[in-house]
Amino acid sequence: MDIQKNTSLTFLFYDYETFGKNPALDKPSQFSCIQTDIDFNIIGSIQEIFCYPSVDYLPDPESVLITGISPKYTSLFGVNEFEFAKKIYSLFMKSDTCIIGYNNIYFDDEFTRNIFYRNFLNSYEWSWKNGNSRWDMLDLLRACYVLRPEGINWPRNEDNSVSLRLSDISLANNIVHNVAHNASSDVYATMNIAKLIKQKKPKLFNFFFKYRTKKAILTLIDVNSLNPIVYISRFFGVVNRYISYIVPILWHPINSNILVSIDLSQDVQKILNFFKRNSILNVNYKEIFLMGIRFIYVNRCPILIPTNVIRMKDRIRLRINYKLFQNNLVLLRKNIFLKKKLKKFLCSIAEAPKYNGSNVDLKMYNSFFSYIDNNVIKNIHSTLPKRIKINFMKYDNRINQLFILFLARYRPDMLDYSEKYFWIQRYLNIFSYANIQKYENKILKLIVKYKNHVRNVQLLEELFEYVKYTRKNFLKSIFTN
């Protein structure tokens, strides 16, 4: 679909700043978003929300230094994560919204899913329901650099490799980006990069807009013909110009979102010899990945294009060994046994190992909630702030575990005796003497490292005091309820 014909569509550019890098374990500190029409005219005003962390969490000191956002600041000007999640969910669930970030597919979207999961909101519907979709400007910019670099300034690192950092790209192209690692500033910069690409490369912009959804991407893929397509990804690295020719060979028999393909830049004969010699019982994922088997997640907006997009001058510029690709393709087509062997191997291996530990925050990807489970989750929202009276034992056990943590974090007065005991034990594990010593030593080392940097020292001292305050406040909240 031509983007100009979709007049009801809006873009929502967004960004998080966080207290750490792990989407399941770390917490958000700031969210910002701007909504625009398809011509990048801003609708309404920028939305900015700060979020203070729950008491069972230690912010990463280095992340605080990067963003300049301290937990003290968020406690003064922010909301708790439950209120934070509800506000974001209401923005994301507006129909016909394309939700866009910069490296959001692998970072911000993962934080979104986990934030919604912890707070009884659907982790996935926001990105596909009611005509919604998602898109990543970093991947689009990378595709632009690989395919049609003319007209955009490409900054360089010290080793002369291209830099796709948001701050560097913005500076090189006269895009205002006042404060790096500030969500509001990053959002404006991301929007203007999208605008730049659409102005300079309208055909490329429209092509990848059309093929941003799983449904559209599937039309580019034929696993039966063994015809190659071009794949552009950070996976290949700047050394390989982020590009390779791949051959789709089959759909993963367990996860239908995974396209199993062969990388034609690798030694295909080695792959064939390996599967001829080895029983599937002696094969593992690491080995096949190193040899050139590629898993492409079609629900993550991969950059896939027909081979005819690559012109002769592109092959020369990108130093593509086209003869190698052709020879490997001939080999593959002569050895159709590989497809059967791969399928048998993939069927013999269970799904990716599920997390079986006690921390429910890490269990989002263990499985989808059922339709019945999702109805229970909706009921939790509708009955709050009263305590819902449901026999959680009848449902997915994660719901009960999440609910106990939810009450402990936001309504500790509602905990019964056994739940309170669980909460205290969890807290004592996180804030054990050894953990606190290690954490405080890390802060002290950073204070020494940045002793001449007033801002950093102030942030670290605030963090030191915050930990003391949190420990004191936790004990108070438990023993006064």
UniProtKB/Swiss-Prot annotation:
It catalyses: Exonucleolytic cleavage in the 3'- to 5'-direction to yield nucleoside 5'-phosphates. Residues 12-193 form the Exonuclease domain. Mg(2+) 1 binds at residue 15. Binds 2 Mg(2+) ions per monomer. It is an enzyme of class 3 (hydrolase). Keywords: DNA damage, DNA repair, DNA-binding, Exonuclease, Hydrolase, Magnesium, Metal-binding, Nuclease. The record marks 181 as: Important for activity. The N-terminal exonuclease domain and the exonuclease C-terminal domain form a central positively charged groove which binds the DNA. This is Exodeoxyribonuclease I. It comes from Buchnera aphidicola subsp. Baizongia pistaciae (strain Bp). The gene is sbcB.
